[in-house]
Amino acid sequence: MTYLFVAAGGALGSTLRYWLSGLIAGAIGQSFPWGTLVINISGSIVIGAFATLTGPDGRVFIPGDWRQFFMVGVCGGYTTFSSFSLQTLTLAQEGQGLWAAANVVLSVVFCLIGVWLGHVGAVLINEGV
């Protein structure tokens, strides 16, 4: 049953990623993979908060299947490491090494900050602050 939950969550997350990437590309342009960057940062914030809120010390109880639905399915389908990797390679192959390096640095730094912010926010919620 967990596999069905994960598959359904993945379908939702992937659809949301596709929609939001298109929205961002239409608004900002496609010279840099801003959509992927925004998605990976926001996905990191969300999974950091959700994992902490629903973890052993969390304030919110979520049954295991539903936790997997959201964390593995929705967040896994929403975030885009393979897309990030391909877009970085494409930038490098097109002679845009500085943009490729910026994509790596910005993605890693801000996704780590995002997951930390999500975690800290959830810890505060768990503590009733």
From Swiss-Prot:
Recorded family membership: Belongs to the fluoride channel Fluc/FEX (TC 1.A.43) family.
Organism: Rhodospirillum rubrum (strain ATCC 11170 / ATH 1.1.1 / DSM 467 / LMG 4362 / NCIMB 8255 / S1)
GO MF assignments: fluoride channel activity; metal ion binding
Residues annotated as transmembrane: 4-24, 32-52, 69-89, 105-125
Record function comment: Fluoride-specific ion channel. Important for reducing fluoride concentration in the cell, thus reducing its toxicity.
GO BP terms, alphabetized: cellular detoxification of fluoride
Keywords: Cell inner membrane, Cell membrane, Ion channel, Ion transport, Membrane, Metal-binding, Sodium, Transmembrane, Transmembrane helix, Transport
Reactions catalysed, as given in the entry: fluoride(in) = fluoride(out)
Regulation of catalytic or functional activity: Na(+) is not transported, but it plays an essential structural role and its presence is essential for fluoride channel function.
Domain of life: Bacteria
Protein name: Fluoride-specific ion channel FluC
Record InterPro entries: FluC
Subcellular location per the Swiss-Prot or TrEMBL entry: Cell inner membrane
GO cellular component, one term: plasma membrane
Binding annotation for Na(+): 76, 79
Membrane topology: Multi-pass membrane protein
